[in-house]
Amino acid sequence: MSPDELQSHMRALGYRTQNDLANAIGVSRSAVSLWLEGKVGVPRPVAMLLRMLLQAQRRAF
């Protein structure tokens, strides 16, 4: 998952800040920051979780 894709998923899921996402998925805000800056790749389980949440949200509406 690219930093742009992560940002897009965050917005679509209603996470307005890095801290919002970090709290929701149980990681540190600094980890989210590193992912968004592209310094560290988004771990595969996190990317999968965000994609699943987005799909579930789309199906609910």
Task: Say what each PLM segment does.
Residues 17-18, 29:
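Helix-turn-helix DNA-binding elements, focusing on the entry/boundary residues of the two helices
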Residues 20-22:
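Short alpha-helical "recognition helix" segments of helix-turn-helix
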Residues 44-61:
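DNA major-groove recognition helix of helix-turn-helix/homeodomain DNA-binding modules
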